[in-house]
């Protein structure tokens, strides 16, 4: 698997709605109507199967060939079907499958006997049975349950699909080659799966849902203890202008109501209603006469009166086809961001207005009428999406999420929800020869969490993580347009967002905006995260004229002509886009050198923001590590060996003194012993000195060997080394750093050259503040800078994080050996040249 970080790939094949009542489970609705044709890019699928077979998990050769024959036999029908769909009315455009036409998809035909597995919630890898026991996709005969191609099934009346004289089976009562009753049983779990991740694996597909069961008291939501105030029937929105925090959402059994809902007409519009019981009654009456036809509603009400049935469970199941090596990541992101939140919103509306059950009955009634009239598949789905808000919601979620867009779904006049998989806004890698390229994606390492920012940070943190206070906000749209959307939303965050947007500048960090505007830093970070999450802004290092910017190697030159026209409209009197890109393609130099005068500063900053917004340029940043020369290594080696020898000699002298003292005490106690016996024993000990154990002798040698553990025998003393992480240095690396610091001069060479006053007494004058970094001993500056010399943190962070002037910081870095395109006239001391630096994005 490549290290390239990929944009969201939902791998979405279909969405299924299953409900269970006292009469049993029911397959209510699925979209798209025929995933076999809408996701049928068979050549790509063949490559995936071939790669899996190499790993011992693919099909056998005969099965693969059978599948290939089955796929090719229906190509002509599919081509004819595509031509028919292209000529469809605009009202039926939702059946064309254009949303997923560019996605990697396949033939998902399933046998009656399929290998499947059910796994509990979690982020585990695909279960073993999903890759084993695979069945071939065989073309079936007249008695088959395989779903027919929609070109034949949707545009003509059929006498029956169960053979000559058999009962009529409409095409919408089967999915992926299996009849609806199979899916009803398979995707209707037991109550033990209530509000848990329910996952079923069948061949290459994953079926993931979040089933919701009715409570024992017959309600769908735990009733909280109400205080003496009116009941609030509101769903706090999660799009622009609305807070998506769990504590601001309605109380739920698990303390989180899904969070990302909003009301409104447009993508960024949102409204939150607080309804009294009277308003709720009016809202129900309004909803009853809304999008659905009154005749159909009255028919359903009649059925409800006779049936007296009630729903006990609903499960919205998402059918996914993720790549095998990305299975866990892709399923987790769509489960956390889409499946769970969508099901929670439906649960909340079901508890409030019996929404899911009413819509399920309405959909079933429309399908029964279509079956009686033998309506075509296209006509039925057009009718369902026009008349059922739940069917329309599932359709919107599928089409938007498949295209990696924000799905704004309106469940009722009072409640809507916005869902998305947070997009990838940047990448630190250039694609390799075998990797898929994403031209125009911002190429930078600036948004990565580094050890200095958060040493314990997890790479898989949530998208709403707190942004670093030293970042700035770059709006991805016109400020006036965003302000208009925010003010129109009317959400709880709208006033704060509008105030922050007016104060925000890409040249000022969050901390600087907080200090100048009086807005608390935590509030700014929350508002900025809100804008970033909803794709209206991007967090970047603050723009500065002393920073260096280059043309991004990942820029999309195919859009240069369109971008040039847009650039000309935005900056008509300034150099054209090709000229700006040509200038930035030369020798890297600070951006301030491109600004003609101070009067043009703000305008050129606006140009830079425009270029960054489109991914045309990226910041060229410097990184450094501490270099340990052979001279330093040898000095530390000699010092360590001297310490070991001294320690060994000290222990030896102390043991000899102890031995002599013990000998004197022994002679006094044994002076009356037999002389010959004592002499004999003494001679024997002297004759076998190498074989007779002496107290402490081997223990001393052992201690000497163990103390050598600091001396790494694999380290070469003749070559230089780099210290990767100075703030987590090993004992030996710590000794190297101590030796480096000990060699720094006490008085810099330039200390006397940058004092105020001239003449013989200049050395005793005050230090010029402009050159304070050149006159300060490096030993005093070293602790502030060393933590950034890890090769991961850009040196451009130091002035912002430490609150230092950029000029002084670069003077210190130049003394330490930083190589830049602009070399100053600073006199360097070789004893301070300890850095190895590189420059990249």
From Swiss-Prot:
List where Low complexity composition bias occurs. Answer: 61-73, 84-106, 288-299, 675-689
Q: Where is the composition biased (Basic residues)?
A: 43-52, 221-231
Q: Which Pfam families match?
A: HTH_NPRL3, NPR3
Asked if the record carries the keyword Phosphoprotein, the reply is no
Query: Please, which domain of life does this record's source organism belong to?
Result: Eukaryota
This protein's GO CC annotations? GATOR1 complex
Compositionally biased spans, kind Gly residues: 257-267
Q: In what ranges is there compositional bias, type Basic and acidic residues?
A: 232-245
Q: What Gene Ontology biological process does one annotation of this record name?
A: positive regulation of autophagy
The UniProt keyword set, sorted, is: Meiosis, Signal
| Biased amino acid composition, Acidic residues | 246-256, 665-674
**Signal sequence annotation:** 1-23
* InterPro entries given in the database record: HTH_NPRL3, Npr3
Q: Does the keyword Signal apply?
A: yes
Biological role stated in the UniProt entry: Mediates inactivation of the TORC1 complex in response to amino acid starvation. Required for meiotic nuclear division.
Q: Which family does it belong to?
A: Belongs to the NPR3 family.
What is the name attached to this protein's record? Answer: Nitrogen permease regulator 3
What is the organism field in this record?
Neosartorya fischeri (strain ATCC 1020 / DSM 3700 / CBS 544.65 / FGSC A1164 / JCM 1740 / NRRL 181 / WB 181)
């Amino acid at each position: 698997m490549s290290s390239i970080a990929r944009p969201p790939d939902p791998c979405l094949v279909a969405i299924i709605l299953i409900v269970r009542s006292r009469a049993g489970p029911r397959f209510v609705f699925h979209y798209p109507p025929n995933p076999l044709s809408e996701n049928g890019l068979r050549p790509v699928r063949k490559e995936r199967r071939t790669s899996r077979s190499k790993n011992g998990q693919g099909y056998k050769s005969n099965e693969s060939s059978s599948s290939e024959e089955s796929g090719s036999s229906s190509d002509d029908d599919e081509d004819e079907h595509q031509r028919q769909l292209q000529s469809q009315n605009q009202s039926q455009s939702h059946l064309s499958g254009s949303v997923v036409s560019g996605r990697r998809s396949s033939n998902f035909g399933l046998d009656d006997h399929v290998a499947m597995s059910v796994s509990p919630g979690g982020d585990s890898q695909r279960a073993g049975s999903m890759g084993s026991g695979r069945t071939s996709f065989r073309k079936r005969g007249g008695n088959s349950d395989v779903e027919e191609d929609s070109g034949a099934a949707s545009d003509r009346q059929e006498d029956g699909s169960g053979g000559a004289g058999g009962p009529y089976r409409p095409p919408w009562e089967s999915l992926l080659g299996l009849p609806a009753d199979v899916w009803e049983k398979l995707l209707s779990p037991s109550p033990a799966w209530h509000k848990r991740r329910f996952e079923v694996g069948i061949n290459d597909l994953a079926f993931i849902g979040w089933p919701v069961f009715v409570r024992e008291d017959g309600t769908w939501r735990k009733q909280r203890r109400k205080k003496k105030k009116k009941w609030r029937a509101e769903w706090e929105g999660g799009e622009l202008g609305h807070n998506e925090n769990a504590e601001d959402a309605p109380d739920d059994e698990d303390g989180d109501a899904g969070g990302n809902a909003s009301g409104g007409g447009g993508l960024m519009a949102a409204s939150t209603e607080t309804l009294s019981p009277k308003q709720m009654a009016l809202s129900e009456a309004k909803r009853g006469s809304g999008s659905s036809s009154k005749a159909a509603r009255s028919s359903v009400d009649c059925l409800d009166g006779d049936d007296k049935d009630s729903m006990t469970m609903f499960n919205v199941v998402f059918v996914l086809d993720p790549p095998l090596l990305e299975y866990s990541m892709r399923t987790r992101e769509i489960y956390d961001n889409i499946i769970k939140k969508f099901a929670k919103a439906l649960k909340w509306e079901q508890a409030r207005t019996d929404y899911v059950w009413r819509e399920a009955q309405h959909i079933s009634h429309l399908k029964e009428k279509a079956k009686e009239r033998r309506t075509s598949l296209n006509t039925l789905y057009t009718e369902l999406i026009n008349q059922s808000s739940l069917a329309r919601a599932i359709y919107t979620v599928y089409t938007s999420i498949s295209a990696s867009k924000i799905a704004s779904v309106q469940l009722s006049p009072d409640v809507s929800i916005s869902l998305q998989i947070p997009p990838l806004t940047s990448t630190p890698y250039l694609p390799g020869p075998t990797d898929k390229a994403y031209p125009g994606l911002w190429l930078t390492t600036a948004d990565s969490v580094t050890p200095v920012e958060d040493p314990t940070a997890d790479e898989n943190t949530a998208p709403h993580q707190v942004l670093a206070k030293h970042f700035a906000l770059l709006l991805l749209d016109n400020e006036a347009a965003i302000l208009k959307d925010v003010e129109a939303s009317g959400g709880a965050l709208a006033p704060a967002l509008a105030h922050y947007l007016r104060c925000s500048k890409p040249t000022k960090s969050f901390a600087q905006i907080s200090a100048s505007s009086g807005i608390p830093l935590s509030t700014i970070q929350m508002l900025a995260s809100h804008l970033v999450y909803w794709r209206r802004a991007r967090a970047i290092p603050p723009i500065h004229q002393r920073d260096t910017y280059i043309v991004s190697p990942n820029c999309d030159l195919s859009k240069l002509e369109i971008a040039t026209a847009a650039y000309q409209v935005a900056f008509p009197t300034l150099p054209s886009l090709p000229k700006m890109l040509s200038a930035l393609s030369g020798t890297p130099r600070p951006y301030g050198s491109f600004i003609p005068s101070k009067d043009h500063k703000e305008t050129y900053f606006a140009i830079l923001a425009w270029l960054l917004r489109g991914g045309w340029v990226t910041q060229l940043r410097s990184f450094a590590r501490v270099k340990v020369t052979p001279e330093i290594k040898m000095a530390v080696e000699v010092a360590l060996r001297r310490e070991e020898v001294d320690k060994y000699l000290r222990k030896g002298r102390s043991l000899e003194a102890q031995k002599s003292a013990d000998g004197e005490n022994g002679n006094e106690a044994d002076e009356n012993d037999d002389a010959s016996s004592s002499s004999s024993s003494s001679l024997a000990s002297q004759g076998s000195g190498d074989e007779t154990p002496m107290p402490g002798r081997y223990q001393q040698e052992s201690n000497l060997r163990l103390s050598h553990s600091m001396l790494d025998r694999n380290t070469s003393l003749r070559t230089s080394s780099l210290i990767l992480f100075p703030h987590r240095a090993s004992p030996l690396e710590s000794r190297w750093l101590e030796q480096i610091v000990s060699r720094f001069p006490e008085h810099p060479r330039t200390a006397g050259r940058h004092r105020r006053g001239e003449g013989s007494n200049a050395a005793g004058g005050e230090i010029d503040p402009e050159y304070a970094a050149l006159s300060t001993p490096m030993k005093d500056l070293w602790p502030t800078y060393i933590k950034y010399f890890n090769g991961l943190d850009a040196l451009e962070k130091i002035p912002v994080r430490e609150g230092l002037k950029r000029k002084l910081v670069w003077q210190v870095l130049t003394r330490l050996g930083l190589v830049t395109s602009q070399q100053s006239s600073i006199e360097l001391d070789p004893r301070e040249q300890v850095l190895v630096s590189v420059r990249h994005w």
